[in-house]
Amino acid sequence: MKTPTTELDNTAEGAEPASGVRPDSSPRAAVSRRYGWLSRLRSYFIFDPLIWLVTVILGIVSIPVSLLGEKGRILHGFARFWSQLIMKIICSPTTVTGLDALDTSRPLVYAVNHASALDIPVLYVYLPFQFRIAFKKALLAYPIVGWHLRRSGQICINQQNPAASIGSIRAALKSLKSGLPLVIFPEGGRTRDGQVKPFLPGAFFLAIKAQVDIVPVALVGTYELLPMDTYHIKCRPLEMRVGQPIATAGYTPRNMAELSDKVHRAVEDLHAKPVGQ
């Protein structure tokens, strides 16, 4: 049952507006109505400039520092510090559930829904261990970000055709077998409507080849915080919900789709839980 908008208070419930155009009832429209011009000013003139400033300064400082010692571990520390600053800037407290039940001393693949550019800072702050991220090749074109992805040992994967990324796959398998966890975004990109998109089966190729368990992770609230195609950051509480590991034993590249569906259902179930549960 539809609710009339404020401007149409006198319109009969469920009736067509006089203009013949129904108000936008999409998730993004609902979010936009909740956060007005004051929120936009705060975002455009405080949050966004501070985030860019922190990113540029730390990005420049990290270049010479990364030449010392093991570059992946040093740059992970920089990424974590950068993420902590961003989370303080955007004033979005995050609740984590389920992580304390995991044995994080063993290598695992974390399958995470991707709703926002700010998913990355959330993961760096609230996953309290070194990890690497599987990412799309297109990200290498971004200044500073692309350089860090190359230097920090992140994994560039073609999720549509994993065999085309054989060098990266070998490096990722080596990392997993050495005990370094991997974070993947199986949707292949950010959602445009806040819902968990279908997963690309190829995203699970590494987990199957390495025979390591997959942990479903749902980030809740990051879409409303900063959806695609906008710089308007809307402060709000967030949740990171971590599920039980899903074994890859018995799966092969031939039946990756079955594993993909199983993990997708687990992430969707976590994401759909009422807030606070």
Q: Can you annotate each of these PLM segments?
A:
Residues 1-34, 38-41, 166-277:
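Non-catalytic C-terminal accessory region of glycerolipid acyltransferases
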Residues 30, 43-51, 79-135:
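Conserved H-X4-D acyltransferase segment
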Residues 33-95, 147-151:
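A transmembrane-helix-recognition feature enriched in membrane-embedded lipid enzymes
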Residues 83, 154-158, 189:
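Short, basic, glycine/proline-bearing loop/turn elements
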Residues 97, 134-136, 158-159, 186, ...:
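Thr-Gly-centered strand-to-loop micro-motif
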Residues 115-171:
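Membrane-embedded segments
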